[in-house]
């Protein structure tokens, strides 16, 4: 008996677990088994060409009538999602493609009797780095999927490729993606996955960023004002990001063009130290160290981060300085310009960047970071990263230049910021992702734009779908937001279930503390979910921004509960014809969908004992304050208008003895209620539940019977019991005592 590979090319077809995904695969497309990485279900794909070139495009087969979700770069810096069923629907600059088989069910099998052939098969396409070439996918009018390979340097050429694309398949989409990235990691040996990296401490605390509050006009006084006003409302920030505006920069001399001046000259970095705004007034020799000291000693911050571009500043480092900077002019790949034509007239394109010599880039980063570290700074937000791919001409190409800069950056961060203090930003190209060994946090989408009404639903959809891919490399950061804003709750609830950093960019004195207290505990800590927030399995191929019928559901996990967010993101999306985000008409203002307990993909991991859980869940609606018992596979309808949301805590119900059952919910006034539960133990013989709970506020749980008593530490406390729903609530009126992290709670049934 011959066992056929799960992924193979046969008779011109790409066969995935005996299902045809692509037809008409050309003869010059070749495959290599991934078996060297272990018993994996995937193949590497390459192609052979007649001539050495710096760019090649080859069709790898025709895709028709199979649903897909792609992550593509609609801007140089950022990805967004695009769904379709035909090859022609695949955008330029697609860096991740997930295809669903036409047959089978998307529901996971019910236990050991589930048969794989009855389930959907999910195929992951990962365009890779091979040597000095980077690849991406795109579709053409004939529904062919094309593999585009380019070096970004006319002198860096090649004619033969064997490992430019990896294809992997499985029946669990999330595990399939993780396994695919792991196989690529073992092959490339140039990056690490998220779970292998140290997460910086900022992810577990509330923070503030100066950007939308001050933009480039930020000052020391402004920083202190923001910290002070947030703390005054009982939500003290524990980290701050001093964004663009602290560095020493100057414009080039104005260039005359006849009687008219050209566009205003771009700013370039003139030195690694702070500008005059961040020098101490009575002692100019004391620079940014002054505000760092004030932030930590006076306002109790744990972490201070500052912003810089990967090239130093937007216009790079001014040539003639000590780091060998020379002028380079961005050369965009065709796919980027097709998706974002504004690059043709962008100030960077026209005026260029001062690029630090690759031989001196470690010196540049190390001197900058060591200066900041000596001042007490704990980390950096490194922006403008994708620009490196445009500057590789004459330097070995885009991949080589990106690799050199990122190796230097990683080394400097590891040396100077022991908490691994680095946020990668404007960094969605695979050139960087596939060489990232250090950075553990990455901005997940284009910016939060407080003054752009079209952006808000788009933002939530983008961060969720981008996290499917980006979350394998780093913890996605869903960006800052404003707590006083028409979409404040919409954004805030999403940040609460994102699993990433949680921070606002409010102007000093402009805060909604009622909202912030749903996110932040009195000590400045947050209830962070454990994974990247991602769309539920049944939403992966829906189009909740465009199709007019779908709600977006986002799932995440805590230790002992799951969390599920539902969002109406319809009404706006990136337009492939206008090449920008636009509003579009919807048939109805309100949509109805449904949720199930098992929408939380890993909910079984929240059960302390599989023998006491039959799949039933207690589901708590945060906005309505309602508790519902949902049997396995039973669904609950949810109706939302555009830009409305709902958050549900999902908790496995443990069935104990004598028909008694229990499930913890958490701090019910917080968006991610279940994130408060740090310990859970059932003592069935004593009919007792023991929990360790962080924070303070109203605590809730489900019990099929009225508890005999509830004890916090050693004190019996009053509680309320709703016999119709089984909701038990009581007050934790203060934070745990100073030397303890948790409240010890016992519920006797």
Curated annotation (Swiss-Prot):
Underlying gene: RFS6
Keyword Transmembrane listed: no
UniProt keyword list: Carbohydrate metabolism, Glycosyltransferase, Transferase
Induction: By oxidative stress and by dark treatment. Down-regulated by sucrose, but not by osmotic treatment.
Class of this enzyme: transferase
Function: Transglycosidase operating by a ping-pong reaction mechanism. Involved in the synthesis of raffinose, a major soluble carbohydrate in seeds, roots and tubers.
Xref: PANTHER family: GALACTINOL--SUCROSE GALACTOSYLTRANSFERASE 6-RELATED (PTHR31268:SF5), PTHR31268
GO molecular function, one term: galactinol-sucrose galactosyltransferase activity
The protein, known as: Probable galactinol--sucrose galactosyltransferase 6
InterPro entries given in the database record: Aldolase_TIM (IPR013785), Glycoside_hydrolase_SF (IPR017853), Glycosyl_hydrolases_36 (IPR008811)
Assigned EC number: 2.4.1.82
Record field: catalytic activity: alpha-D-galactosyl-(1->3)-1D-myo-inositol + sucrose = raffinose + myo-inositol
Family: Belongs to the glycosyl hydrolases 36 family.
Organism: Arabidopsis thaliana (Mouse-ear cress)
């Amino acid at each position: 008996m011959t066992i056929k590979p799960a992924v193979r090319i046969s008779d011109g077809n790409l066969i995935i677990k005996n299902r045809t995904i692509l037809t008409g695969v050309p003869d010059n497309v070749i495959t290599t088994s991934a078996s060297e990485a272990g018993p994996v279900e995937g193949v590497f794909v390459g192609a052979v060409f007649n001539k050495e070139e710096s760019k090649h495009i080859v069709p790898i087969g025709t895709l028709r009538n199979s649903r897909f979700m792609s992550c593509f770069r609609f801007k140089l810096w950022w990805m967004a999602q695009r769904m379709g069923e035909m090859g022609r629907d695949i955008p330029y600059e697609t860096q991740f493609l997930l295809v669903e088989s036409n047959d089978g069910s998307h529901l996971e099998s019910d236990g050991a009797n589930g048969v794989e052939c009855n389930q959907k098969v999910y195929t992951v396409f990962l365009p890779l780095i091979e040597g000095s070439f980077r690849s991406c996918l795109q579709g053409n009018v004939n529904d062919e999927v094309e593999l585009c390979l380019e070096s970004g340097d006319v002198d860096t050429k090649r004619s033969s490729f064997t490992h430019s694309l990896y294809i992997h398949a499985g029946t669990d989409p999330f595990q399939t993606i993780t396994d695919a990235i792991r196989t690529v990691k073992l092959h490339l040996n140039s990056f690490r996955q998220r779970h292998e990296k140290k997460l910086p401490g900022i992810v577990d605390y509330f923070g503030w960023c100066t950007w939308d509050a001050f933009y480039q006009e930020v000052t020391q006084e402004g920083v202190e004002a923001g910290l002070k006003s947030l703390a005054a409302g009982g939500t003290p920030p524990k980290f701050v990001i001093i964004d663009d505006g602290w560095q020493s920069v100057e414009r080039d001399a104005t260039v005359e063009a006849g009687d008219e001046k050209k566009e205003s000259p771009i700013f370039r970095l003139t030195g690694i130290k702070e500008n005059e705004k961040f020098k101490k007034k009575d002692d100019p020799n004391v620079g940014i160290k002054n505000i760092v000291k004030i932030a930590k000693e006076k306002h109790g911050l744990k972490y201070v981060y500052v912003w810089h571009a990967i090239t130093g500043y937007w216009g790079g480092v001014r040539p003639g300085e000590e780091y060998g900077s020379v002028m380079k002019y961005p050369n965009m790949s065709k796919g980027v310009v097709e998706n974002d034509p504004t690059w043709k007239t962008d100030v960077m394109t026209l005026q260029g960047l001062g690029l630090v010599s690759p031989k001196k880039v470690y010196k540049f980063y190390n001197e900058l970071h060591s200066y900041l570290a000596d001042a007490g700074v704990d980390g950096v937000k490194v922006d403008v990263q994708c620009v490196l791919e445009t500057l590789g001409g004459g330097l070995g190409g885009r991949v080589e230049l990106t690799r050199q800069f990122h190796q230097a950056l990683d080394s400097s961060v590891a040396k100077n910021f022991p908490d691994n203090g680095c946020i990668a930003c404007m960094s969605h190209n695979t050139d960087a992702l596939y060489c990232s060994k250090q950075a553990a946090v990455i901005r997940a989408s284009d910016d939060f734009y407080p003054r752009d009404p079209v952006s808000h639903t788009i933002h939530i959809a983008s961060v969720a779908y981008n996290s499917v891919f980006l979350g394998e490399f780093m913890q996605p950061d869903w960006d800052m937001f404003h707590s006083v804003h028409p979409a404040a709750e919409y954004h805030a609830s999403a940040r609460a279930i994102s699993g990433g950093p949680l921070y606002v960019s409010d102007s000093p004195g402009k805060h909604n503390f009622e909202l912030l207290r749903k996110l932040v505990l009195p000590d400045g800590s947050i209830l962070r979910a454990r994974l990247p927030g991602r769309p539920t399995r049944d939403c992966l191929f829906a189009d909740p921004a465009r199709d007019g019928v779908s709600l977006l559901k986002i799932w995440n996990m805590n230790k002992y509960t799951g969390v599920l967010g539902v969002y109406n993101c319809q009404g706006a999306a990136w337009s492939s014809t206008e090449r920008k985000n636009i509003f579009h008409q919807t048939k109805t203002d309100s949509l109805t969908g449904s949720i199930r307990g098992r929408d939380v993909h890993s909910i079984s991991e929240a059960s302390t004992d599989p023998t006491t859980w039959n799949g039933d869940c207690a589901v708590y609606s945060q906005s309505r304050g309602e508790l519902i018992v949902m049997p396995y596979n039973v669904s609950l309808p949810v109706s939302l208008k555009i830009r409305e949301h709902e958050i549900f805590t999902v908790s496995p119900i443990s069935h104990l003895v004598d028909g008694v059952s229990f499930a913890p919910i958490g701090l019910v006034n917080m968006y991610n209620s279940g994130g408060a539960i740090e310990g859970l133990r059932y003592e069935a013989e004593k009919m007792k539940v023991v929990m360790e709970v962080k924070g303070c506020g109203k605590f809730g749980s489900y019990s099929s019977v009225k508890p005999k008593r509830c004890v916090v530490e050693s004190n019996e406390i009053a509680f309320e019991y709703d016999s119709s729903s089984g909701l038990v609530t009581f007050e934790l009126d203060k934070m745990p005592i100073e030397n303890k992290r948790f409240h010890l709670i016992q519920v006797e049934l």
